[in-house]
Amino acid sequence: HADLRLAQLDDVLNAHEEAAEGLFRGIRHAGASAGDIQGLAIPGGSDRNLMSNEAFRAGVARLGERGLTYDTWLYHFQINDFMELARALPATTMILDHFGTPLGVGEFAHQKEAIFEQWKEDIECAAACPNVFAKLGGLAMPDNGFGWHERSTPPSSDEFLEAQARYYEHAIACFGVERCMFESNFPVDRLSIGYRVLWNGLKKMTSDFSEEEKDLMFSGVARRVYRIDAK
């Protein structure tokens, strides 16, 4: 992590480079801003105007200049702010984590379908930015409103797909397999779903994809974006 607004950002990035001994690839400076939203298990504490902050934008631009990536976690109502950032800084590779976290608790608990419909439009617009990649996972967090963390037994892979496959399918349709990477979001999602169950569900969901397409989403895109030399 690094606060991308820092005037001494290069000093911090240099320290990361040195400590990582060639394995440093990018920064995740979360943008999730909960404000006064009630009922969140993991409330994001970022500045609501972070994405338009001049110092922050300069920091994100600096990542691109250094060949580093920018990851963000934010809420569904902030995806438009992220799109503006991505359009303004096309030279920086950006990764949208956790589907943009469509919330489903508190004031959003009874708006799931309306939020989903707006989310679909926003994801389609975000995918129009060629420098943006989608990290698909993290929907089992309590704040997404599926309630699995409150059950006595976790969901099966079929239950997982019944509830969440439409999010994955839409994101893949918008971004294409060349810009999607699957994630577990563990240990956070461990509150709601088993690790093997999650990955088995993703394997079931992608059963009709070609081997090449599956390789991209399960590993290839991540290897390319984060420059991982898998030997």
Language-model features: locations:
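A generic structural motif
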Residues: 1-2, 28-31, 96-103, 213, ...
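Mid-domain alpha/beta scaffold segments of enzyme catalytic cores
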Residues: 1-66, 88, 109-110
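Short catalytic/ligand-binding loop motif for oxyanion handling, primarily in non-cytosolic enzymes
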Residues: 5-7, 35-38, 80-82, 102-105, ...
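Short glycine/proline- and charge-enriched loop/turn segments
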Residues: 42-44, 148-154, 196-202
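Mid-to-C-terminal alpha-helical segments outside catalytic/metal-binding sites
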Residues: 166-181, 189-231
